[in-house]
């Protein structure tokens, strides 16, 4: 499951660029608001909210913004009601796509999703058409400079480690059951081991390996989704061949 890190490496680099976009805080505020609405405003008893707050802090969101988002979720402040809707479909070369959205206008969002698909050689599928290809997991990245593979295995197995991706030259990818992600984070915190990008992820059971031309088309499609304010996250079973990596990095 975790041996496919070339697309993960590109996603990590893309995230640095995405952080410069004005839509990042909008997406983070939505997630905090939704999490607070669903599970209450106390992060100690709401793992989804706790993770959302941690992500916001990691991206330098001011605490005032975080608190306002929480209060909008709990109803203490007036705010927009967000509906979470997940779309499924296929992109170039038959790769599977899951698009998670949070919207205040369902008709606008589905029209936007269809438009983006049609302009980028994709097609919208029925609910359940590709979801069975993915597993929901907790993931985070540990820089190789922070810990060794044996050290992480020994430390995290009892905390709930399921898999440790080691193909990336700069990071280990820790994969856990969703319910164990907080335990794994605490184990790393207690050991003073730095980590990044802790999140709930959708990981494909199997990957479709693409060459550079098709990979570029898929990345263009994903970029179009991620530039839409209603889209919170995009998942795919694309993997990029070794021969395509050098071309994509040019």
Curated annotation (Swiss-Prot):
GO terms for cellular component: cytosol. It holds the Pfam family Transcrip_reg. GO terms for biological process: regulation of DNA-templated transcription. GO terms for molecular function: DNA binding. Its main location: cytoplasm. SUPFAM superfamilies: YebC-like. The keyword Cytoplasm applies. Transmembrane segments: none annotated. It is found in: Cytoplasm. Keywords: Cytoplasm, DNA-binding, Transcription, Transcription regulation. PANTHER family: TRANSCRIPTIONAL REGULATORY PROTEIN YEBC-RELATED, TRANSLATIONAL ACTIVATOR OF CYTOCHROME C OXIDASE 1. Belongs to the TACO1 family. This is Probable transcriptional regulatory protein Ppha_0657. It comes from Pelodictyon phaeoclathratiforme (strain DSM 5477 / BU-1). The lineage of its organism: Bacteria, Pseudomonadati, Chlorobiota, Chlorobiia, Chlorobiales.
């Amino acid at each position: 499951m975790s041996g496919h890190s070339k697309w993960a490496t590109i996603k990590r680099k893309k995230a640095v660029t995405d952080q410069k976009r004005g839509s990042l805080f909008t997406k983070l505020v939505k997630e905090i608001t939704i999490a607070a609405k669903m599970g209450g405003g106390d992060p100690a008893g709401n793992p989804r909210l706790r993770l959302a707050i941690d992500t916001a802090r990691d991206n330098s969101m001011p605490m005032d913004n975080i608190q306002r988002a929480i209060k909008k979720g709990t109803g203490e402040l007036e705010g927009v009601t967000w509906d979470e809707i997940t779309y499924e479909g296929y992109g170039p070369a038959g790769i599977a796509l899951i698009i998670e959205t949070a919207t205040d206008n369902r008709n606008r969002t589905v029209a936007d999703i269809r438009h983006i698909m049609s302009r980028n050689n994709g097609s919208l599928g029925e609910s359940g058409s590709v979801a069975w290809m993915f597993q929901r997991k907790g993931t985070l990245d540990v820089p190789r400079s922070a810990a060794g593979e044996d050290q992480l295995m020994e430390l995290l197995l009892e905390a709930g480690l399921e898999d440790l991706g080691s193909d990336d030259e700069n990071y280990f990818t820790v994969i856990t059951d969703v319910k164990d992600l907080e335990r794994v984070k605490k184990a790393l915190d207690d050991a003073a081991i730095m980590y990044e990008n802790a999140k709930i992820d959708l990981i494909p059971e199997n990957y479709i390996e693409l060459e550079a031309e098709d990979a570029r088309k898929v990345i263009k499609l994903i970029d179009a989704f991620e530039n839409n304010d209603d889209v919170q996250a995009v998942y795919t079973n694309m993997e990029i061949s070794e021969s395509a990596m050098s071309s994509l990095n040019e």
